[in-house]
């Protein structure tokens, strides 16, 4: 698991970006957020996540808000 901070997240569109500890921006889709109910993230929120290589670059999976 990696640690990061939510750079921005658009709840209407269901995606955003996490900035990893190494400064890399990682795409995050709402379906990767491991919470019950409405899946959204807040700017500046701390998260842990796994990372995989997507079609357009790094993508977060198994995102867990802290």
From Swiss-Prot:
Cellular location(s): Cytoplasm
Induction line: In response to low temperature.
Pfam family membership, one: CSD
GO function term, MF aspect, one: DNA binding
Residue runs in coiled coils: none
Signal peptide (UniProt feature, chain positions): none
Domain of life: Bacteria
Keywords: Activator, Cytoplasm, DNA-binding, Stress response, Transcription, Transcription regulation
Domain CSD: 4-63
Gene Ontology CC, one term: cytoplasm
PANTHER family: COLD SHOCK DOMAIN CONTAINING PROTEINS (PTHR11544)
Protein name, entry field: Cold shock protein 2
